[in-house]
């Protein structure tokens, strides 16, 4: 009888441990969040050289809390990414005190469900004009057409982000213009000028520290 009780107890313990291990490996998919019309150093007018003028501001954003962060907290780890015109910064390297990093994945947002183990996260290095999310037309998330003066997100480009505190997120830029629209080449000069630098994007943030979405 005692042996039976011991055996039953051991069996129950093993079953509980097995269940516990199974529960630890369960990954709950995260839902995508859409951010609309996030202003990013919006245009105030044209300079004498015909170039757009602005206040040269930067908009800081927390992917953890899904909200803009005050510029007075730029030297903190409260923000994860920042926007200024077409430039996107991460909280790491020369851009901030965090351990953030990023790389650009070529593929669809929905099908990118896990970060490969051999992925290399780059950091910002403003001194060398090198950024985790590269600057320039065709290099990361957008193209610029000099004839139409329009900025267009590139389909199938996913920004993979390591946040300021070491968690992970993925981002897809949907629109660069107010209202989340794609401006036609025939849009007015005023629309092209003053509706730009308003980001609409969607992102998925994994709060548990894993690299699976």
Residue ranges of model-derived segments:
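Bacterial N-terminal signal peptides that target proteins for export
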Residues: 1-7
């Amino acid at each position: 009888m005692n042996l039976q009780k011991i055996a039953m107890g051991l069996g129950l313990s093993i079953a509980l441990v097995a269940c516990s291990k199974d529960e630890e490996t369960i990954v709950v998919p995260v839902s995508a969040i859409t951010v609309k019309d996030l202003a990013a150093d919006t245009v105030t007018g044209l300079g004498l050289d015909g170039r757009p003028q602005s206040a040269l501001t930067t908009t800081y954003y927390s992917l953890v809390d899904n909200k803009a962060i005050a510029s007075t907290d730029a030297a903190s780890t409260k923000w994860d990414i920042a926007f200024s015109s077409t430039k996107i910064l991460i909280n790491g390297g020369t851009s901030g005190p965090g351990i953030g990093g990023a790389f650009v994945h070529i593929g669809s947002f929905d099908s990118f469900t896990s970060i490969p183990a051999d992925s290399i996260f780059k950091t910002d290095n403003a001194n060398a004009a090198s950024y985790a999310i590269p600057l320039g037309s065709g290099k990361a998330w957008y193209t610029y057409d000099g004839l139409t003066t329009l900025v267009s997100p590139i389909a199938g480009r996913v920004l993979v982000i390591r946040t300021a505190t070491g968690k992970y997120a993925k981002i897809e830029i949907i629109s660069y213009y107010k209202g989340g629209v794609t401006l036609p080449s025939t849009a007015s000069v005023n629309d092209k000028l003053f509706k730009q630098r308003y980001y609409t994007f969607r992102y998925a943030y994994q709060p548990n520290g894993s690299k699976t979405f």
